[in-house]
Every structure is written in C-alpha cells, then in structure tokens.
C-alpha cells in the first residue's frame, strides 16, 4: 500500500466537509486499524514560501482511520492560529502526516538531534501545568539549535517567566513523514474512478 493514501484520505475528508457530502472511501480506510499517534498538517505555497495553514495531532495512539478523520478536520478548520481552510484554497494546499514513533523519555531536554527528533516538554510553574511539542521538522525549518528550540517550546506552552529553575520533563521522538499535494489527490481519485 502507498502511504500517500493517508494524505489522499485527509484531503477527501476536508473536501467532503466543505462540499457538504459524505466521504468517499476509495482507499478502504476502514481497514486502517493500526493504532498510532500522529499529526496532520496543511500548508500552502512551495519551498521556502510554504505557509502553515493548520497543524493538529495527538500523542494518543488510536486507530489510524479515526485519528486521520478527526485530525484532518481539526487541522483544516480548528487550528486557532489560522482562519479555517476554504474550498477555494484546496488546490493550493499540501497535506503532510507525521506518524510518531520511537518515543524516549530524556533526562536532559537538550538531548535530541535537530532534524531527527521531535521534542515534547512538560513542566509546572506557579502551580500551573504547561506542555508543548515541536515535530522533528520544525527546528530544522526554523534553523534553531536545541537551546533556541527549548526556549521557543517554553513560550509556545504559554510560559514567559524565568526559565532557570524550571524542572522540565522531556520526551524525544521521531516521525515518518508522508505528504502529497491536492493535485496528487485529484489525480489519484481519477485513477481510482
């Protein structure tokens, strides 16, 4: 099976939602019962001009079809950082799925490699719990080192106080990235009839 089918399916879910119709399961998605954590991301543009349009996922392993269906809608319509994706912009989009694997708790929140690992942090400050994560591609795309990434993660979590005394719990992980364009999705639909 071509793993790009996962991306085709995400585009189908978003298109069906925007067109107020049922999802066509051309890929037998109901058979995708393997449980795995994942993130779904939509972006517009190409290369260095690529702009994120939505990215939401989970560390909770649930059946693949369940996570893909739910998080394709969440990334397209519910990421509060962006306006919801519209029908008119679908043709400009790429979909990327990150299947998350190889989770490892780490003692030092800087013990991971840029471009290889994603990192998830958790900490408590003033009685409030904070957490955030970056997928493996983020630090490399931003050209951050581990320290810059950690500082950004702390701010992403919503904490802006002193970071010197924070007791951070960190986990590193890897991802299997799969991507396709909307054009590839349409071409695949055409091939499947």
UniProtKB/Swiss-Prot annotation:
Residue ranges of the TM segments: none
Record protein name field: Uncharacterized protein C688.03c
Pfam family, one: AMMECR1
Classification via InterPro entries: AMMECR1 (IPR023473), AMMECR1_dom_sf (IPR036071), AMMECR1_domain (IPR002733), AMMECR1_N (IPR027485)
UniProt organism field: Schizosaccharomyces pombe (strain 972 / ATCC 24843)
Span of domain AMMECR1: 1-189
Gene Ontology cellular component annotations, sorted alphabetically: cytosol; nucleus
């Amino acid at each position: 099976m071509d793993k790009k089918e996962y991306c085709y399916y995400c585009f189908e879910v978003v298109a069906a939602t925007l067109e107020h119709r049922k999802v066509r399961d051309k890929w037998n998605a109901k058979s995708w019962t393997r449980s795995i954590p994942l993130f779904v991301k939509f972006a517009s543009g190409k290369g260095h001009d690529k702009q994120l349009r939505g990215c939401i996922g989970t560390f909770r392993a649930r059946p693949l079809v369940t996570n893909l269906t739910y998080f394709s809608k969440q990334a397209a319509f519910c990421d509060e950082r962006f306006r919801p994706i519209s029908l008119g912009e679908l043709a400009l989009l790429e979909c990327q799925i990150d299947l998350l694997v190889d989770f490892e708790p780490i003692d030092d929140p800087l013990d991971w490699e840029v471009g290889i690992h994603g990192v998830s942090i958790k900490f408590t400050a003033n009685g409030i719990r904070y957490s955030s994560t970056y997928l493996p591609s983020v630090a490399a795309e931003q050209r951050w080192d581990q320290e810059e990434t950690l500082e950004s993660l702390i701010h992403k979590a919503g904490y802006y106080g002193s970071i010197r005394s924070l007791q951070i719990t960190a986990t590193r992980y890897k991802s299997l990235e799969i991507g396709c364009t909307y054009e590839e999705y349409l071409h695949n639909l055409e091939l499947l009839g």
